[in-house]
Amino acid sequence: MRSCHRWLLFALCLNALGAGRARAGERLTLNFNPDWKFIRADPAGAAAPDFDDRAWQTISAPHTFNDTDTFDDWSTPGHVGEMNQWSGRTWYRKAFTLPPGTAGKKVFIEFEAVRQVAEVYLNGHLLGVSRNGFIPFGFDLTTLLRFDGRKNVIAVMCDNSFEHETDMHKLTATALPWNSPHWHPAHGGIYRNVLLHLTDPLHISLPLFSFLQTTGPYVYATDLSDQSARVHLEVPVENGRDRDAAVALQAEIVDAGGHTVLTLQADLPVAAGSRSQFNVEGELTAPRWWEPDQPYVYRVRCMLRVNGETVDTAEVPLGLRTAKWTVDQGLFLNGRHVKLHGWGQKPTDEWPGLGAAQPDWLHYYTLNLMREAGGNFVRWGHCAGGPAMIAAGDRLGIITEQPGVDGEGDAQGDAWTIRAAAWRDMIIYYRNHPSILIWEGGNQKVSREHAAELRALMDRYDPHGGRAYAHRRADEVTAEFMDVGIGTEGGREIARLPVVEGEYDREESPRRVWDDYSPPHFGYPEARGQTYQLTSEQFAVNEVGQYVGKLGRAAHSGGANWIFSDTTSGGRVSVEVARAGGEVDGARLPKEAYYVCRAMFRADPQVHLIGHWTYPAGTRKTVHVASNGDDVELFVNGRSLGHGRRSDRFLFTFADVAWEPGEIRAVASLAGKIVATETKRTAGAPVALRLTASTGPGGLRADGSDVALIDVEAVDAHGERCPTFQQRVDFACTGPATWRGGYNSGEIKSINHLHLDLECGINRVSVRAGRTAGAITVQARCAGLADGSITIESHAFPAENGMATVLPAMPEVSLPAQRPAPAPDFLASVVAPASVPKAGGRFTTAFSYSGPARGVRVESDALDARRIFADRDGYFDGLPEALQGADHVLTANADARYNAVDLMEIAVRAGAIVSVAHDDRLQRPTWLTRQFQPTRQALTIDHRHRMTIFTRQAERDESLTLGANTEDAATKDALMYLVFVNGAPAAP
C-alpha cells in the first residue's frame, strides 16, 4: 500500500508540472536515467539482486567515469590520442518497482549507448552483451520482472578497456579498432540516455534489432512535388497476447503546428504469438520541404486499436526531401543546388570536465553553434552520432553523414561481425530521420565482400530513404557499391562519382594564442619545432584559402572541415592537451576561425575583423577581414585606411596598419551598397570579473545529470572584455551541485580544479546538478579585480524508483512561415585551383594528397635531370634503372614533418611496381614497413643524403594509402619520401 501511495503522489506531482502520463492503453515511455548506484571497481557477485550496493555512489545517466581524466595530458604526436585514461570493469545497479497497474504489460529497456562493453543483468539473469559502444540497444525485460511490488534489480557491467597499442595495425584479432583513443576517447559508462518502454503485449515493435530482432515503423515519401507527396508507412506489429486479434491501424501525419494533415487507416488480423506488418500509403497535399533553411519535420503518430480501444502508440519523424548527387554540379536538394559547408565531429562530442556524458540540450548546443555559423552539414567521425545529435540535426536543418562504427580501415573476424551488426542496427534505428542523407560505410575502403555486405544491409533496411552509400579513401573495389565518394583535403579518389568532402583543413591552433603581436604570448613560441604552430589569426586566415581552394569548384558538393571542437582524440602537438583543430575549443568557446566560417557560410551579409584592437604601443600589423561582401573599407578612429586587397573571395587584407587606442571598424559592401559593419574597441584596464550562465530549456533540472555552463570574463570599466588578459581565477561553489570546472588548453592537469586561467579574457566552467533542488552559487576571484558571482536555481525533478515521466529536454526551433528563397552561392564566381591532382602518369590510375602543400602531383617519365620536389630546387642524378621511365609523385619537401595517417592515396594497375625512397636518417614509419619490402638500392639526394628504396608489386588493381614521412615528432632534418610507379617487368 505504501508503494502504491508513493507512486500516486509521484504521478500527481508530475501532472502538476505539466509532464502528464500516457492515456489508458497507450505506450508509456519512462526516463530511466535517475538514481543509479555506481562503483568504479569490479566486485564479485555485483549482478546478484541482493548484492549490497549501499556504499556505492549515486549517479544519474548520462554518466561517464572519465569525465575528470580527459583534456588533462599532453597530446602524443602521431595521432595517438589520450591513452592515459582510467579503464576497466565498472558496475551500475538500480533497484526499482514497477508502477501499479503494469502487470500484463510488456516492458522493454533501451540504452542509447554504453561504452564500450555492456553486460546487462536483470534479477541476476544475463540479458545479453553489447560490444559496439555507440549504437542503441535494448532488451525485453517482461519474463524476468516482478510485477507484484517486489524490487527488481538491473545491473550493468561496463568495461571501457582498450588496447594501448599505438600502432593500429598491430591490434590483436579480438580488438575493436574504433575502441581506441586514436579515434574516440575512451569515455566509459552509460553515457547516453536510458529509457523504459511499457506497452501492451500487442504492440508496435521497437527499432532495436540486436537482442529483440525488431525494426520499428518505417516512413518515406515518393512522387514529391510542391503540390503533393505520396507518404508510405510500414508498421510492424507483434501480438504477444494469447488470442488472435483483429487490429486496426490509424496513422496520423501531424504538422509542426500540431494539426493532423493526413490520416492513414488499415485493418489486419494478427495471430496470437505472431508478427505482422501494416503497409499503408496516402497523398499529402501542399507538403512542406525539409531542407537547411526550412527543416520542416512532420510527426507520424501510429495507433493500434482492438475493438475500438487504443492498445499502443508509437511516433516517428518524417521529413520530405529529394536528393540528387551529380558529378559536375554537386548536390541538389528538393531541386535546389546546395553547397555543403560544415564540420566533422566526434560522436563522443566530449567536453572538459563532462566527457562524453551530457544532457541532450548540450549536444543541441554544439550543433546550434554550427548552424549559427551557417553550417548545413555534419560528418560524424567515425562512429554514429547519438539520438540527441541526430534529432538536433533534424530540427536545425543540418545535413548529416552517419557512419556505423569504425576507426580507419577494414576489420576482420569478430570485430567485423560486430561492426556489420552495428551498421544494421544503426540504419534501422535512424532511418526515419530526414537530416541523414549519407550512410558512411567506413572511414576507408574495405574488401569487396565487406562492401557488398554493408550495401546489402542498407538496401534491405532503408530501400526508400533516398540516401547515398559512401566511403572515405575508397578504391575501385569499394566504389562498385558506392553512390558518392568522401574526399579528403579536396581530393577525389573516384572520378566517376560525386564527391562530398570528409576532412579538409586539418591544421591546428589553440584559442589562447591571438597573433604575433598580442601579450602575453606574442605568437606561439611553445610550438616552435612542432608540425602545427599556427596562431589563432593565422588559423583563421588559413580557413579562407582552405575552403575556397579545396571546396570552391562547382563540381564539388562541399562538405566537412575537420574538426568542429577541439578533441582529445588524434592529438598531434605535444604542447597541447587536445587536438586543437576545432573552430571552437573544447568548452565550445569560439576561435577567430569560427567567425570567419560564419562570414563565408551564412547567406545574410557578414563581416568579421579577425583579432582584437588592444595592442602594445607602437604595434604595426597586417589586419585581415573576412566578409561575404565584395569590398571592405577599414576605418581607425573614423579615418579611412582604404579598401582591402581581396583574395580567395572572402578575405580582405590591409597591410602595415598602425595601432592606436580607440576603435577599428570594417565596412563591407556588396554591389556598391553597405551591407554589414563590425567595430572593435580598445579595452581599458581590467577591473572586474563577470559571470554569465547558460542552461537547458526550462532551466537547470535537479536530475543528477543536467549541466549549467558559466562563462567567466575579465572586463574593463565599460563592461568590455579584456582580450589579452590571462590570469588565474579561483572559484567557490555552494549548493546542490558538483563542480566540474573547465580546462586550460596549454596546461596539463587543469581539469576539475577550483581554479583556472582565463584565456583571451574568458573561460568557461560547468557544474552538474544534484538531485536536490535549490540555489547554486558560483563565486570567482582574481587578484586585482572585483569578484564575480552568479546564482543558478536548480528545479525539482520528480522521480520514483529511478524513473520519471519527464523525458530529456531539447530546445524547440522556430520555422519560417514560407519557404525561403534559395541562398546565394558566394563560391559560384570563384575560380579555385584544382585541388585534385590528375594522375598524369602511365601507370597511376588515381592520386590524391591531403597535405598542406600545393603543387603535389604525378608526373611521368622519371629521368635524371628531372625535378625531385615540387617546392625546392634539386634534380635526379644517378636514378636507378628500375625507376627510369616510372611515374613519379612530385612531393613537397615542406611536408617532410607533416603528420597524417592518410597523406597520399595512389591507385595502380595489377602488376605495377610501386617504389618508395625513404630518408635513412629517419625511423621507418609503420605504413612503409607493413606494405613495402626494403631493397639494396638507394637514391642519393644533394650528393649526401641516402634514401633506401622500398618496393611492392600490385597483385591486382589496388589503391594504397601512404602515411606521414616520420612518426617521430622530434625529427629536425630529413627529406620527404619519394614515390615511383612503374609497369611490370617484361617476361623473360
Residues covered by each model-derived region:
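Active-site-adjacent substrate/metal-binding segments within catalytic domains
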Residues: 66-98, 102-111, 115-123, 128-131, ...
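Non-catalytic, glycine-rich low-complexity segments
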Residues: 26-43, 55-99, 110-112, 159-243, ...
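Short flexible loop/turn segments that cap and initiate beta-strands
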Residues: 49-52, 245-250, 292-299, 620, ...
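Extended acidic/polar, glycine-enriched regions
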Residues: 146-151, 234-326, 654-662, 670, ...
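Substrate-binding/catalytic cleft of secreted carbohydrate-active enzymes
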Residues: 308, 361-370, 376-589, 593, ...
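Beta-strand-rich structural segments
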Residues: 233-237, 303, 623-626, 667, ...
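Short S/T/G/P-enriched beta-strand
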Residues: 602-622, 681-709, 713-722, 787-829
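Accessory beta-strand-rich segments of carbohydrate-active enzymes
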Residues: 30, 42, 87-213, 240, ...
